[in-house]
Every structure is written in C-alpha cells, then in structure tokens.
Amino acid sequence: MNGNHKQALSGVTLAAIGVVYGDIGTSPLYTLRECLSGQFGFGVEPASILGFLSLIFWLLILVVSVKYLSFVMRADNAGEGGILTLMSLATRNTPAKWTPLLIILGLIGGSFFYGEVVITPAMSVMSAIEGLNIAAPSLDPYIVPLSVLVLTLLFAIQKHGTATVGKLFAPIMLTWFITLAVLGLNSIFQHPEVLGALNPVWALRFFAKYQTASFFALGAVVLAITGVEALYADMGHFGKSPIRRAWFMVVLPSLVLNYFGQGALLLAHPEAITNPFFLLAPKWALLPLLLLATLATVIASQAVISGVFSLTRQAVRLGYLSPIRIVHTSEQESGQIYIPVINWMLYISVVIVIMSFEHSSNLAAAYGIAVTGTMVLTSILSCSVARHSWHWNKYLVAALFVALLAIDVPLFAANLAKIFSGGWLPLTLGAVMFTVMTSWKSERFQLIRRLNEHGNSLEPMIASLEKSPPTRVAGTAVYMSRVVNVIPHALLHNLKHNKVLHERIILLTLRVEEVPYVHNVRRVCIEQLSPTFWRVVASYGWRETPNVEEIFHRCNAEGLSCRMMETSFFMAHESLIMKERPWYLYLRGKLFMLLQRNALRAPDQFEIPPNRVIELGSQVDI
C-alpha cells in the first residue's frame, strides 16, 4: 500500500469517526446512569455495577463488532447499506411467495428509524446540557430552553448544508473519544478491580442474582448500542474498511474505558450515580467537558438528521413515499441533501418531545424499542440474503439466525415493557410512517394499473397514426410514459381535444433501479418505433436525481436531436374520485389523495422549464 493511499484511508477513517459514531459515541452520557438509577429495584452495589459493565462490554462485542461489522456489512448494494437496501437485496433471489413479507419487514424497519430519529437529538443534547446540574445547580431550570435553542440552531442551518462545518466534525469527535478514554483510564487506575467485569461470568451472575429484574434491565443496557444501525446505513459514504478501522482502533477502546471508568467511580462513590459521566472529570474540567459534550451530541444529531434525509430520498425514489422537494446542498457530494418538509416536521416533533419529557431520564424509557426492533428485522433480512444470495449452507444460516435472535429478541422484549412509560412514542411514529408508505405504494400501484387497463397498446396505435396521420405541427413533443408498451394518456387526450400531433414524438420513460447509481453507458436507451415516433428509456439509481436536460444531452450524443426550447412536454394530471369502499380502504384512499395533492409536480421533479410544460387533466375513479 503506497503512502498516498494510506493517507487517504486514514482521512476517510477520521471522517467516519466524525459521522458514523456520533450516536453510539455519546451513549456514555446516560447509559450507566439509567442502568443503575434504581428503577429496576437494585441499588448501586458491586454485583449490579460489574454485571451491567459486563453486559455492556459483551453487547458492544457481539452486536457491534461481530453482528454488524463482520456479518451485516457484507450485504451491500454497490457499496450502499441501510435497512431498505437490505430489503432490496433480500427480495432479489428469494422465492416469490416470501417477497411481500420481506418488503413489509423492510418497511417496518425503515419506519422504526423515523421513530428513533425524533428521540435521538432530544436525548443526546439534553444529556449533555444536563451537565449544568453538576457545574451550576442553579441553572437547572434552563436545561430545557437551552436544549431547544441548540436544536433550533441545528435545524435552521440544515438548508445551508453541512459541507463547511462538517470538516470540523471529525476533529471534534476524535477529541471527544480521546477525552472519553482519558477520563475512564484515570478512574480505572484508581480502582483496577473493575476490569473483572470483562469476564462474562459477571453478566451470568447478574442474571442469576436479580432474575426477573435483570431481564427488564436489558431495556437500559441497550442504550449502549443505540446508533448501531448508522454503521451499516453510512457504509456507502465511507466504505467498510474505514468504518471497521475506526471502531476497533478508536471508538471501541474509548467506549470501554469510559464505561469501566464510570463503574470504577461508582464502586468507590455510589452517590455519583446522579451523573457518573460528568463526575469523572475534575471540577476545573467541567465546563470544557460540558461544551465538548454539547458539540458531540449536536454532531450525533446531525448524523441522524442526514440519515433521515437519505432514507427519505431512497423511499421516494423506490416509490414508497410521494415525490417531495429535495435540495442538493453540495455540487461535489451527492449525499449532501436537504428536505425542507422532513426537516421542519422533525424539528417540531423534537421540540414537542423535549418540552413534554423535560429530562433525559424520562426520555430514556422511549429510547430502545425502535433500535432493537430494527435489530431483529436486520437479523431476519441479512440471514435471508446469506441463504438465497450468498448461498450459504442452510444449517449454518439456521444456526446463525438462532444465535442472532437469541440476543436481539430478549433486548426487544425487554424494551416492550417500556411502552406505557414512553415506548409508545417511537412505535406510534413508526406506525404512522409505515401507514403512509404502504398506503402510497399500494394506492399508486392500483392507480397505474387502472390507467393501463384502459390504455391502448403502443405498436398498433402508432401504426394506425402513421397510416392515417392527424394534422402535424412543427416541433418535438415529449410524452411522459410510465409503461413502455402503452400509449400515454396525455397523447390520447391531446389527440381527442386538439386533433393534432407534433412532427416528432418522443415517449419518455424514467426508471429508478434498486441500485444507488446507474452507469452512464446504461443511462439512456433509444429506440425508433416509426418514422416519427421514438421511445427513450432513461434509467437512474435511487441516489441520483433524474434530469431531462441531461437525458436530452445523451440523446443528442446518440443521434436523436433534442432541444429544450423547441420541445413541448405533455403530462397527464389525474383528478382522483373516490369510489365506494370499506371504511379502512376509504381512509387509505383519502390519505393517498392528500399525498397526491401535495406531491411535487413532475416538471419540478425532472427539472423541466415550466414554460415548456402542458398538463392535460382527466378524472380517475379509485
């Protein structure tokens, strides 16, 4: 490996530290405090301290290091990861009868992420600012307003992109992880007996001693691995090797040292349970640590916000959400996007959550259900990929499946116990998003099928028009066509009402494939159907934005002359009329009509000049 490559790789590794590990890296702020807060019925005593530390350590090893970094990250779609990507991979080679179930599981996983994303910024930022209690107890009433202020500033700058401030993320997070390690080491040196918790026997003793209470305590232990999905979701931005290297070289050692440092502090001073993280620091370091913690939690929140933007774009491109406005904030990086409606809906939700729960300890009850639910679904989908795409031995996959669920299911079940104390929040948000996605996909499919049922077959219609041509006018007309073998409705309406056709007709179909990018050589496929009709099929990946001007440029390069200002774009606009339905389908139809009315119009989706667009309306029963 040459020097330049090593330097580039280390730079990407540093960048991964700054983005990927923000959420899991700020978990020491609250995890051990919530584990030992007394809610499970046992006090701050050596058996519980060492038991929790052992559970946290082995969760970091088994879930993060083994499951995600060694197994799940093998499943990539042209380098991209994430739950919807995993869903796409799982449905490729699986028997058709299982496909609907796998799609539903993938959509539930995506919906869980929307539930989690509301809680993460609130939980992280509040936990950091609660350090004011230690530095200046009189400032306690200002924790909620300060948390809202910090997050207001964060959401307000989203429209400007994070390319500039993003350069600071990596050094800040590296400083954060070094600080975690130093604080923990200092405490461990004073009480090295805490290292005994590395032995999994302490976890087993914990279960044996506390029995039922220890099961429910898993709901707090899981806070140590919140954000683990980011490792897989951000794989496309940084690559597998930098993410793995960052974990094993920096993040894992720092987290373990800090957790064990907090444990050592609690062994000597049980009263430090009020906030063991900040009490690790000497008094002179409290304010700098508070500032650093706030910056780290803001960065963690930024990573989650960027993640929900990326997930939303993928869902829109794959047809699970209605088209919405997506703004690219960087000319160099396609991943730098801003979605106004998602940004402000998320901001309002986060502020409501902060003002309702008022303290991170109250919010901790809501945290974990979405994370562990996604973990279960990830295990199911990744094992499906291992069996049907990688063709692993079925007995090996079965053993792996059982081993993964033996960890994931108890964690999820323990978190279900928190439904009435806050766990309802992510479940409700997830249920809303699942309803929206399935309603849009199902109703859109039915609408297109209904339109095509009454459509005319392409070839016979073109032959008829060439044989008995209507009046022709100069110029080029482009008709957007959803299906390549059916005449577009806009063309039929134009013939019906205007009785004319342009001298050149292009039937344009835009396809989004289940890959992040489509190679330029496959971008456009041109077929001449008759002397005056052409069919153009343009293919895009879900990370790309369809652009008609680019399509025209490629058509020109392949011999089909297209000029934007000499072309008219004809598009169909459907007015939907609801037929009689059962009440639950009626509600779904009403939701679809609401989404359709507020969806981004096709000219805006495909960057077509508005003065070149002609929309022809029709009524459609649904």
Curated annotation (Swiss-Prot):
Cellular localization per UniProt: Cell inner membrane
GO molecular function, one term: symporter activity
Reaction equation(s) it catalyzes: K(+)(in) + H(+)(in) = K(+)(out) + H(+)(out)
Transmembrane annotation, as ranges: 9-29, 46-66, 99-119, 137-157, 169-189, 213-233, 247-267, 285-305, 337-357, 363-383, 396-416, 419-439
GO cellular-component term (any): plasma membrane
Domain of life: Bacteria
Keywords of this entry: Cell inner membrane, Cell membrane, Ion transport, Membrane, Potassium, Potassium transport, Symport, Transmembrane, Transmembrane helix, Transport
InterPro entries named among the record's database cross-references: K+_transporter, K_trans_C, K_trans_N, Kup
Membrane topology field: Multi-pass membrane protein
Pfam families (UniProt xref): K_trans, K_trans_C
Family: Belongs to the HAK/KUP transporter (TC 2.A.72) family.
NCBIfam families referenced in this protein's UniProt entry, alphabetically: kup, PRK10745.1
Biological function: Transport of potassium into the cell. Likely operates as a K(+):H(+) symporter.
Protein name, as recorded: Probable potassium transport system protein Kup 2
Organism phylogeny: Bacteria, Pseudomonadati, Pseudomonadota, Gammaproteobacteria, Aeromonadales
Gene: kup2
